[in-house]
Amino acid sequence: MRPLSISESAKKIFPIHTKRELIDIKETDFPAVSAVILTKTDIDWIKKINELHFDLPIIVVIEEGNEEAKNNFSKFNSTVVIDSSKKNIELYSRKIESLAQKFENKIDSPFFRALKEYTLSANSEFDCPGHQGGEFFMKHPAGKSFVDFFGENLFRADLCNADVKLGDLLIHEGPAYDAEKFAAKVFNADKTYFVLNGTSTSNKIVTNAIVAPGDLILFDRNNHKSCCHGALIQGGGIPLYLQTSRNPYGSIGGIYEECFKEEYIRNLIKEKCPEKAELKRPIRLAIIELGTYDGVISNAKQIIEKIGKLCDYILFDSAWVGYEQFIPMMKVCSPLLVELGPEDPGIIVTQSVHKQQAGFSQSSQIHKKDNHINGQDRYVTHKRFNNAYMMNSSTSPFYPIFAALDVNAKIHEGKAGRCLWHNCVKLGIEARKMVIKNCKYFKPLVPPIVNEKKWEEGDTEEMANNLDYFLLKSGAKWHGFEGYGKRQYFIDPCKLNLLTVGIDIEKAEYEEFGIPAVIVANYLRENSIIPEKCDLNYILFLLTPAESFAKIENLVTQLCEFEHLLDKNVKLEKVLPDLVQKHEKYKDYRIRQLCQEIHDFYKSKNIALLQKKLFLKEYLPEYVMSPRDANIEFIRGRGELIPLSECKGRIALEGSLPYPPGIICVQPGERWNENTQEYFLCLEESINRFPGFEPEIQGVYFEKKDGKSVAYAVVLKKEFEPKK
């Protein structure tokens, strides 16, 4: 591997002797250098470099004997002052090389450092994996193409645990343990576990470690399906469902404020398990989505204060966040920054590092913060927790994913991590301002007025440090969410949620014309811009420190171009050529016609209201049997596949859900009711009316019948239904 370069501006007065590549300061990519050599006129560069918080060694070259300049520069961090005397070039060159090498040695995280060293050792391999550093692949043209595409190091780093030098990933020893210990420190956890097959598995590990059959589970109705699988189906927990909000745009909101009241929770317990209703701490585990897919993030401190005394543990599923503790204004949103005592619940946080942090796909981590209850009966020891970890983990881990988790922690260490996210937040603010300024059919989900000024008139730096600019104020009409309390929820500044026209948000009604977001999403994809997801009248873009101003400008430019095409009402083939090519139906369509037809369909079905009712207690399907029992009936073959049109009143054996977002609408063991049936029948009708815009649906099966897609679901055969 090549050593890092040196950035310099002092070439003329200090010709350093080095084998490293020298790069002009004005052309420098600072993450790729190990030292910077400057002159006394470069004081502005010192400030810029220090603002990155990389702790790069900075060497300032001054004239020999210039004590004033020496004193001026010595006050800066990581700065070394040398003179330009020719007689000292060799000495200073060695000093600079020493500083550069020392910097290189400390930038790598524990496991990644060990992995690099191991792959360079050129061992003769007679173990797994069978490709043995890529050599097997190289025996065939197809394999060589594969290796050439990914690069040799990836294959050399794909190792077997037959050699224990890197530590055992399942029992947490050696460099593997060092990496998890380091991550725990960075993320303010007592213990951290790296998970290599996604947060679906992380959630199952946590729930398998904590939940036993019959335990009460306070269950956010927004929870990902993996929480149902782990806590309710595998663990056998008894769910107490908490209703959640949706706004007319289709955005996923948080749990209603009333659901966190002790009286409300104890009444739920009386309905399901009255013998536990008066226990001091009746809830074994609460499972709460810290941030929804659509960027509504909770006040974690408030949640812990309200329900903590009722719960042994709270699991914050933070798949869609995890970076909040590195954004100072979001401190109240981080469960890992809350001060905890012996009467508080144990805190578990699961994070999908691959979503918006720096990780390969499937990289996830579990943060365990429960030392404050160590010694109490409710405490889950490492041995018990790790038993669940090993039950859900492969004995053949992919080391590069583990290394990525390790490196992610290093990136977030100290001020550097906070700096990266601060810049991301500022760019997100600028993106929203750009949309407000340039677009007429799109607007960001932000308060219209903050501190008596229009949102977009705020100072970006101030806005990036003031959560008021992202507050979902209780009772405010502009966001459309109901049931929120004071400072209970905020907009995630790192999720750019754009709303499309078509909704009168003050009245929560459909207007005469609207732009369904699915059309915009398809248009952007056809123009090489990939949004994360969309629903009825909103489209979501994830923001990370990877973003650039150029990317944002390109996005806004394409949105403006879409508006231009819409105003001209051009033929659809000019907007969505791939769609028209694949589906004859749209051959003579113009863009406004397609927008109008889908909008009218939404309006005629009032699908936003149907979606909202899916998650309200009043309209939840009847709980007939536990999800675990329903799944057992499914395994025993006691289910039957029937048309969805006949499902009303029947007991579901599978969770049914659109994907994304992976939130179950009908849980196993619940009885299909009118609202749930109508919602999925709407999806069935939309699939038939608007080919090319089909959503992915799980737990509902589609079969062709008389040229149309017909929806089916698996329900319990009537002869096996519980007797009333």
PLM segments and residue spans:
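Mature N-terminal, pre-catalytic/accessory segment of carbohydrate-active enzymes
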Residues: 1-4
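Conserved PLP-enzyme active-site core in the AAT-like
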Residues: 7, 17-28, 39-51, 55, ...
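Non-catalytic terminal extensions of PLP-dependent enzymes
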Residues: 7-165, 173, 185, 264, ...
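Short, basic, glycine/proline-bearing loop/turn elements
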Residues: 33-36, 165-169, 190-191, 285-289
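Long, structured ligand/cofactor-binding scaffold of large enzymes
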Residues: 141-234, 240
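Alpha-helix N-cap/helix-start motif at coil-to-helix transitions, marked by capping-box chemistry
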Residues: 173-177, 396-399, 518
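A short linear hydrophobic-aromatic micro-motif
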Residues: 192-193, 350, 528-532
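Short glycine-rich or small-residue beta-strand-to-loop segments that form or flank ligand, phosphate
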Residues: 193, 286-289, 539-544
